[in-house]
């Protein structure tokens, strides 16, 4: 027997603005905390003892110095200066609206972007239409997707995002009361059931969700090499020529 394998979960992030008191309260609950870059000091970030991301201003000409501040990743918007993408420090998370055109999403593969964060916030319930829109962003950008959910979002809906291949959810924490909401989300994620078995046949040549490998391309089974035809023996070649 032994213990049952733990069900796969979903990442849990929180944004706290410049409120480091709330950030400290969340440090042992969430997988990463996002704070405003202008309000962060190296001492505050080190005190959190957590994975920390910084939100750059929308028109930033350069990214925050992640190494000096001790942060792990930066969140940028479409208005950021393109030169900021040249920085090789930490991971880059790009905020995108749901209505981003297909061509722009495909072009993300050419940029040093690690993760896509959806700008719009999901309300209390998740509709199939919304889910399809999120999956479009993830599939066309070939990047892991973070979905922002409101504090009113029903915790039992989190498993639907997990089953669809969403990498993580991000919760805006704007009040002290929101801390309890994030804790409830953590409890729900830790108690996730195993994903449902898919009974119908699947095309295994394409991944269910386009999450890139380290090389930046989705995993897919390799086609077996076709054997070369064996050469004809000399006497057979003579027989063919004679005929």
Language model feature labels by segment:
Residues 32-41, 72-84, 115-124, 162-184:
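Glycine-rich phosphate-binding active-site loops on the catalytic face of alpha/beta enzymes
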Residues 49, 54-143, 198-201:
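Conserved anion-binding
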Residues 13-19, 35-39, 54-59, 75-79, ...:
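Structural motif
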Residues 126-174:
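Hydrophobic secondary-structure block in the mid-to-C-terminal portion of proteins
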Residues 22, 41-44, 48, 62, ...:
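A general structural detector for well-ordered alpha-helical segments in enzyme core domains, enriched
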Residues 175-242:
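C-terminal helical cap(s) of enzyme catalytic domains, especially alpha/beta-barrels
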Residues 1-56, 221-243:
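Conserved N-terminal beta1-alpha1 strand-loop-helix module at the mouth
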Residues 22-25, 60-68, 100-110, 151-169:
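Catalytic cores of alpha/beta
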